[in-house]
């Protein structure tokens, strides 16, 4: 079973595209040395940590015309 479930992740964002972009940007930040915002991640992989942070609302995104920014 995948965690977090994709259908529940899609409730946190407005589209699949936004989910992919936000997760990729956050994963890149983690790869570049950012500290994970969750204490006990289910995985050590950056994309898994990023999706868990989105699911648990630790990562917020703002959508503009050309970009998606994460905080």
From Swiss-Prot:
Belongs to the RNA polymerase subunit omega family. InterPro entries: DNA-dir_RNA_pol_omega, Pol_omega/Rpo6/RPB6, RPB6/omega-like_sf. GO terms for molecular function: DNA binding; DNA-directed RNA polymerase activity. It catalyses: RNA(n) + a ribonucleoside 5'-triphosphate = RNA(n+1) + diphosphate. NCBIfam families: rpoZ. One of its GO terms (biological process) is DNA-templated transcription. The gene is rpoZ. This is DNA-directed RNA polymerase subunit omega. It comes from the Bacteria. It is an enzyme of class 2 (transferase). Its EC number is 2.7.7.6. One of its GO terms (cellular component) is DNA-directed RNA polymerase complex.
